[in-house]
Amino acid sequence: VNSPSGARGQLDYLDQAGLELLRATERGQLVQGVWVYKHPLDSDGLAAFHQRVGAGLLGRLIERSPLPFARPHWVTREGPQVDIITAEHPRPPAELMDWADELATRPIDPEFGPGWLLAVQPLTDGTTAVSFVVSHCLVDGGGAIVAVWDAILGNRRDFGYLPPRSRGRIAAAASDLRATVREVPNLVKGLSAVARVAARGVTSARKSGAAPPDPAGDDATVVIIPSAVAIVDSETWDARAAALGGNNFSLAAGYAARVAEHLGRTRASDGSVSLILAGSGRTGLDDDRALAMTFATAVIDPSGVTQDLTAIRNAARAARAKVATEPDASLGLLPLVPWFPQPMAKAFASEMFAYDDAPPVSCSNMGDLPDDIARVDGTT
């Protein structure tokens, strides 16, 4: 098991930060996949997938330490956590994304469960949709693909996690206290990062003005954010990217920048877009981190991306290189997140996405996926 944090089963700093920010902000991030089958669904095959996918990266939940400042651990929770949710009545294909959005409002929790769910929706044109929804605190996009792929192929990964509540409170507290003492050097480094981040925060606040109101407030309601789905033939996509002097990734980034421009999410100073490029930091199939991710910020001029992708390709490459040599100072605060009171945790979340005078725009690209990823019911 690759646990960069050290101890087996202990959450990585970024994973723990994700959990703490979930609790502080009450905004849960999810990963969702949708498949549409044009032929009859193999119900037995999907049931077998449902049994197998609840292993490895998805066969777990988070268990808190008895000590409020100590790091949580992964514990086993293998097998389905809820039954497959099968709709009784078909819906029009035009409502496919409405259905997907509705699934995302169901209770999903990485600590108390269920951490993930699987659902089926017949459509009135004879096709059938399948959706898989999982807490982002359990896996990122790359981890979800690994989990789904393993379940389809019948692979099983054992990360050696303990059963829930198996350590005993006294033994767990003693073990976690020793682990916390060993992490004192990391805490000291975190404290040294506070001044750097505070200075940057003052600068960002001056540029961006007052913080936007918290959309949750005291009377939080579910807000469905508008979305759109486009299906483009991969050969057409690659050909267009090549014609513009780019590649599959830079065309996606250019498209995101152009959409951002249309939505008015540009910098007031020069009309450029602050594009957050999410990348995978996963070191292999046995890397058990939930959030094995890297984030690079590229400043993009959206006006020329429809003629030439060279600039955006170079900007993205430079942004990723900078992340490798100059890590974001905010990441140095991760060891301190468990010690933050909730208001400070919320401020930390805002600081992580403070980008001068521009609202951030995210762009994720999972790349080319294996053909097997389409066979959640065992058929193609």
Regions found by a protein language model. Give the residues of each.
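Soluble acyl-CoA-dependent acyltransferase catalytic core bearing the H(X)4D motif
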Residues: 2-10, 34-44, 48-55, 59, ...
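N-terminal alpha-helical "arm" segments
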Residues: 2-25
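TRNA-binding/sensing appendages of the translation machinery
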Residues: 25-31
